[in-house]
């Protein structure tokens, strides 16, 4: 909040504050729109945004075209082809109280000279999506981007079950809506992220954005995205005259529309709608962060038009964050499998958004410092994305005068080794590979179903094995005897035999399970399989260069660096030797793709860009891989052929600069026929 009303700032003070706010907001916009990794909640962003608006209104000469108040979305910065929106995808104005909403309605009625009917809709917490159909067939899906230029995500959109690939009528049209991740899918994804050593997503909106913008469509397909469609572009060509009719029309074509929209003719009906969904939002299977009012009459919408940034005929009412007050009694630091040390607040139990909350993640030391969170503080909690408990703010007025700052550990709470920051990481990390807490997590992960699949070796058994000094790393599992297991609590002959059998059977697993089970940073189950199939055995992977690993399709430099760093460690090399001596299989024994030696792309690295008349991108990728090609997502000096369709974008320019051979669709068809 501003230190004083905007009108009381001098011009010099206002200019300094405006520059400060713009810098902060632009950083947060970059994190939200481009990186899909916000570091502040929506309400914190909104508060700063409104401060900037107030100062610009008080001093119009300070308004510039590049101010966050004048722009939609963020600068496009990705490997996706660019899409020009013929009709801009604008943002929405918003209000934060029913009083402000009523004032907006009063201005609307005054402007048009008569009462106005609104179509009232839920504000889905996702990201805006445009879908274009030609003769009933989906030809393009794109993100909002900066409002004028978005990203072509057609290949990923094709994996979303609720998006019709063929309409029920052969119409050519554009619709827009929201791509979101259901709450259940979000919970499943974050559980998988943690299992695979990845970073959990902050909320479903960012999970949806990150999933839709994957270079590998198979990743998108696995993440269970969904859509609600709510805008019909150029509705007059279909004789649709109201927003409510447009939703029914789109539903009849096969689109998924939200069933909760309704027409309201007065603010009392709108107030009832708001109260209903303020109460019911937790029970919905998807996240909402407000409601939207749209002038129902489409001709009146056209008459009202738009500002440079927002339509004049719609407004979003954003729910205030549901909060609960509690007291922090402790901050507990725990060590994860990859060594990240994470703080958790232990609090008085409190009811929040339908559940009892007694713990909340504090994410990292920087958050504790930035929010000045202390043990004994009274704090307000909210649920990020209606799911993850977080501390909104500290009620400093209730803090006892002698409360010291929360201590930030300098050494690992498990092993006592000094904690470090790696690269540009915010997280504190223990890099001791023998850290007991990490070893326990690593052993549990190693035995998990998607890794070595050692049935019966869960966290409680692992903890007992450690406590009795029977295992110190995963190789020790293969030297356990019946006599060792007999020392465990409540472990009888049947349990002993079953666990020994499961351990013995795991020796024969194909090596991708071992690679995943080792818990290498950034290496999930899919990456492990790709690497195992590509290199054939663990020895070739261990001796491969970072560049050779990075060039494997769908792997890249981050995983390449992580693998080389991991296998350089003397402790890891010793561990692999021990696994080899324990007769653990180190070769890939899974299915392999047939290699076609006489095709024009056999053994070559191919990049596909642009749109094609005869192919969808997924179908073309599959066909080329069947001919022996390695299809990758980005152009480099290792690329052998760029296959370029229409609207090829930056990949074409990069290929030209690197003198990479370029093949158009006509040439491609000719080669496929040969």
From Swiss-Prot:
Residues 596-674 form the BRCT domain. The active site is at residue 123. It is an enzyme of class 6 (ligase). The gene is ligA. Gene3D superfamilies: 5' to 3' exonuclease, C-terminal subdomain, 6.20.10.30, BRCT domain, DNA ligase/mRNA capping enzyme, Helix hairpin bin, Nucleic acid-binding proteins. Its cofactor is Mg(2+); Mn(2+). InterPro entries: BRCT_dom (IPR001357), BRCT_dom_sf (IPR036420), DisA/LigA_HHH (IPR041663), DNA_ligase (IPR001679), DNA_ligase_AS (IPR018239), DNA_ligase_CS (IPR033136), DNAligase_adenylation (IPR013839), DNAligase_N (IPR013840). This is DNA ligase. NAD(+) binds at residues 42-46, 91-92, 121, 144, 178, 294, 318. Keywords: DNA damage, DNA repair, DNA replication, Ligase, Magnesium, Manganese, Metal-binding, NAD, Zinc. CDD domains: BRCT_DNA_ligase_like, LIGANc. DNA ligase that catalyzes the formation of phosphodiester linkages between 5'-phosphoryl and 3'-hydroxyl groups in double-stranded DNA using NAD as a coenzyme and as the energy source for the reaction. It is essential for DNA replication and repair of damaged DNA. One of its GO terms (biological process) is DNA replication. Transmembrane segments: none annotated. Pfam families: BRCT (PF00533), DNA_ligase_aden (PF01653), DNA_ligase_OB (PF03120), DNA_ligase_ZBD (PF03119), HHH_2 (PF12826). One of its GO terms (molecular function) is metal ion binding. Its EC number is 6.5.1.2. The keyword Protease does not apply. Belongs to the NAD-dependent DNA ligase family. LigA subfamily. It catalyses: NAD(+) + (deoxyribonucleotide)n-3'-hydroxyl + 5'-phospho-(deoxyribonucleotide)m = (deoxyribonucleotide)n+m + AMP + beta-nicotinamide D-nucleotide. GO terms for cellular component: cytosol. Zn(2+) binds at residues 412, 415, 430, 435.
């Amino acid at each position: 909040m501003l230190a004083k009303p905007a009108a009381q700032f001098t011009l010099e003070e206002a200019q300094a504050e405006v520059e400060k706010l713009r810098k902060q907001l632009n950083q947060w916009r970059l994190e939200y729109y481009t990186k899909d990794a916000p570091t502040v909640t929506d309400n914190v962003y909104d508060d700063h945004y409104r401060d900037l608006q107030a100062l610009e209104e008080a001093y119009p000469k300070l308004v510039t075209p590049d101010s966050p108040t004048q722009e939609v979305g963020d600068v496009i910065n990705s490997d996706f082809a660019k899409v020009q929106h013929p009709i801009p995808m604008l943002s929405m104005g918003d209000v934060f109280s029913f009083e402000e909403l009523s004032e907006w309605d009063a201005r609307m009625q005054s402007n048009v000279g008569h009462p106005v009917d609104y179509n009232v809709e839920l504000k889905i917490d996702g990201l805006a999506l445009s879908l274009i159909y030609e003769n009933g067939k989906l030809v393009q899906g794109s993100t909002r981007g900066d409002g004028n230029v978005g990203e072509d995500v057609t290949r990923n959109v094709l994996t979303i079950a609720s998006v019709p690939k063929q309409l029920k009528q052969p119409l050519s049209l554009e619709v827009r809506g929201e791509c979101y991740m259901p709450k259940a899918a979000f919970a499943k994804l974050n559980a998988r992220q943690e299992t695979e050593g990845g970073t959990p997503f902050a909320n479903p909106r960012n999970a949806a954005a990150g999933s839709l913008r994957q270079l590998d469509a198979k990743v998108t397909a696995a993440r269970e995205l969904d859509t609600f469609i709510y805008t019909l572009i150029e509705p007059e060509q279909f004789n649709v005259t109201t927003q409510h009719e447009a939703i029914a029309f789109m539903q009849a074509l096969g689109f998924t529309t939200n069933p909760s929209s309704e027409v309201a003719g007065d603010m009392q009906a709108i107030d009832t709608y708001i109260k209903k969904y303020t109460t019911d939002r937790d029970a919905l299977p998807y996240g909402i962060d407000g409601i939207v009012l749209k002038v129902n009459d489409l001709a009146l919408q056209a008459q009202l038009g738009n500002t440079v940034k927002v339509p004049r005929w719609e407004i979003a009412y954003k729910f205030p964050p549901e909060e609960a007050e509690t007291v922090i009694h402790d901050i507990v630091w725990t060590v994860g499998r990859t060594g990240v040390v994470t703080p958790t607040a232990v609090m008085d139990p409190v009811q929040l958004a339908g559940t009892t909350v007694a713990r909340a993640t504090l994410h990292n030391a920087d958050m504790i410092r930035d929010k000045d969170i202390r043990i004994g503080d009274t704090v307000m909690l909210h649920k990020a994305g209606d799911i993850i408990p977080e501390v909104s703010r500290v009620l400093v007025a209730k803090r006892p005068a002698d409360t010291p700052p929360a201590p930030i550990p300098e050494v690992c709470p498990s092993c006592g080794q000094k904690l470090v920051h790696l690269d540009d990481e915010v997280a504190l990390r223990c890099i001791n590979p023998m850290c007991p807490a990490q070893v326990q997590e690593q052993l549990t992960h190693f035995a998990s179903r998607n890794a070595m699949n050692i049935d019966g070796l869960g966290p409680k058994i692992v903890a007992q094995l450690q406590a009795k000094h029977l295992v110190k790393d995963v190789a020790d599992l293969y030297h356990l005897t019946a006599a060792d297991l007999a020392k465990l609590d409540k472990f009888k002959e049947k349990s002993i035999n079953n666990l020994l059998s499961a351990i013995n059977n795991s020796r024969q697993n194909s090596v991708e399970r071992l690679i995943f089970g080792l818990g290498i940073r950034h290496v999930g189950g899919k990456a492990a399989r790709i690497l195992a199939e590509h290199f054939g055995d663990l020895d070739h992977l261990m001796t491969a260069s970072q560049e050779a690993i990075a060039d494997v399709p769908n792997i890249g430099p981050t995983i390449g660096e992580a693998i080389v760093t991991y296998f350089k460690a003397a402790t890891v090399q010793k561990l692999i030797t021990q696994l080899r001596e324990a007769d653990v299989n180190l070769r890939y024994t899974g299915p392999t793709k047939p290699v076609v030696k006489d095709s024009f792309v056999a053994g070559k690295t191919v990049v596909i860009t642009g749109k094609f008349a005869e192919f969808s991108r997924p179908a073309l990728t599959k066909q080329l891989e069947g001919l022996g090609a390695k299809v990758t997502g980005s152009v480099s000096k290792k690329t052998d052929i760029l296959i370029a369709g229409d609207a090829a974008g930056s990949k074409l320019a990069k290929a030209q600069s690197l003198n990479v051979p370029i093949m158009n669709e006509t040439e491609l068809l000719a080669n496929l026929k040969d």
